[in-house]
Amino acid sequence: MQSIEDIWQETLQIVKKNMSKPSYDTWMKSTTAHSLEGNTFIISAPNNFVRDWLEKSYTQFIANILQEITGRLFDVRFIDGEQEENFEYTVIKPNPALDEDGVEIGKHMLNPRYVFDTFVIGSGNRFAHAASLAVAEAPAKAYNPLFIYGGVGLGKTHLMHAVGHYVQQHKDNAKVMYLSSEKFTNEFISSIRDNKTEEFRTKYRNVDVLLIDDIQFLAGKEGTQEEFFHTFNTLYDEQKQIIISSDRPPKEIPTLEDRLRSRFEWGLITDITPPDLETRIAILRKKAKADGLDIPNEVMLYIANQIDSNIRELEGALIRVVAYSSLVNKDITAGLAAEALKDIIPSSKSQVITISGIQEAVGEYFHVRLEDFKAKKRTKSIAFPRQIAMYLSRELTDASLPKIGDEFGGRDHTTVIHAHEKISQLLKTDQVLKNDLAEIEKNLRKAQNMF
């Protein structure tokens, strides 16, 4: 039995995973569950500005999450937190809506904002977008499975949801299931405990499209990997589409069974890298237009130059600037944006380490010219520092393996993997090398902070 306070806290945990920290802190952190009137879930916001923004931007999103948690369809209403209305909190019994085969219909699991029309295409995600669209148009015929990997907040989940929406819109009665690998694991464990493994298998092996997020969390879970292996085989054999996301390619997921890794590589593997400046500006423009905001170009350029880590933080920064403008009752300018973002920009910028910066730091330490990192020379005095630079590029940046290979003279991504594995092994026993890398990283971060 859950009170609405419990349900709201569970809702906030899901919201937090789908929003940047600045966005969450600005809009959601201070909200509370106020009351339940009939079928209306009432949420209290700290002021009328936040209330209006949430009402315009997040009503459906919150309703979807509430349905996923409770199995009930709620109307969602936001009120100003200053209102002094008191209602008795209601207890809700979860009762998930199932179709005739016992499979959750799945539409409520998809974020309505995550569709292809709202996805901003750039050089870092163009291939992943094209592959996702091809899969949506021809499930199980284009690429199966489709494996998308990349850093946090770069659009992997957006593309997965977009495929789900597209399939449901264009194929009657299509069963689409979206979930994280953590949820798959938790439900599997519960099914064993409650002696309901057959119901669990029916639920996940009778869908047309399975979208599973953050597959890397299956690492080390042998029982869950076994179950997912058979689920994968059943869906694949029945020509059902499987889309998987991860923060790294299959080869780099530790303690993942070889048979699963092999199956993940049957289809197409594509990565998403951080957006370049032009794409970041385009993302901000699209966000501003969608939310009906009039943001000067100089402000968008300023934000795009300061926030270059991922899309969630970029959009969160824009929201923070808008909220700050309203609260202090000042026009939105680049100066106001700098003031609004002063708490998050220093930590963000100080962490920006580039491959070229790593090459400079390693080259200076080992007396290797920058051009030698990209040359074909294999002498130990050059090859070993090059491997160290590749290792650090993998450890300290969000760049993909192909991107790192390109920065080192167009080398294949397998060369990067080999370099990373070699240095990783040496670091376990070689104290001198460990000290060298610590000194290089110290010099690198010092140079970044000076910049």
From Swiss-Prot:
Q: Tell me the Pfam families matching this sequence.
A: Bac_DnaA (PF00308), Bac_DnaA_C (PF08299), DnaA_N (PF11638)
Q: Tell me the SUPFAM superfamilies matching this sequence.
A: P-loop containing nucleoside triphosphate hydrolases, TrpR-like
Region Domain III, AAA+ region, as annotated, extends over: 109-325
What superkingdom heads the lineage? Bacteria
Q: Which residues bind ATP?
A: 153, 155-157
Q: Does the keyword DNA-binding apply?
A: yes
A biological-process GO annotation: regulation of DNA replication
Sequence segments annotated as region (Domain I, interacts with DnaA modulators)? 1-72
Q: Where is the signal peptide?
A: none
Look up the record and report any one GO term of the cellular component aspect: plasma membrane
Q: Does the keyword DNA-binding apply?
A: yes
Region feature Domain IV, binds dsDNA, mapped onto this chain: 326-451
Q: Which UniProt keywords apply?
A: ATP-binding, Cytoplasm, DNA replication, DNA-binding, Lipid-binding, Nucleotide-binding
Quaternary structure annotation from Swiss-Prot or TrEMBL: Oligomerizes as a right-handed, spiral filament on DNA at oriC.
The domain-related comment in the record is: Domain I is involved in oligomerization and binding regulators, domain II is flexibile and of varying length in different bacteria, domain III forms the AAA+ region, while domain IV binds dsDNA.
Q: Which family does it belong to?
A: Belongs to the DnaA family.
This molecule's function is given as: Plays an essential role in the initiation and regulation of chromosomal replication. ATP-DnaA binds to the origin of replication (oriC) to initiate formation of the DNA replication initiation complex once per cell cycle. Binds the DnaA box (a 9 base pair repeat at the origin) and separates the double-stranded (ds)DNA. Forms a right-handed helical filament on oriC DNA; dsDNA binds to the exterior of the filament while single-stranded (ss)DNA is stabiized in the filament's interior.
Q: Which PANTHER family match?
A: CHROMOSOMAL REPLICATION INITIATOR PROTEIN DNAA
Which NCBIfam families does the UniProt record give? DnaA, PRK14086.1
Protein name, please?
Chromosomal replication initiator protein DnaA
Gene assigned in the entry: dnaA
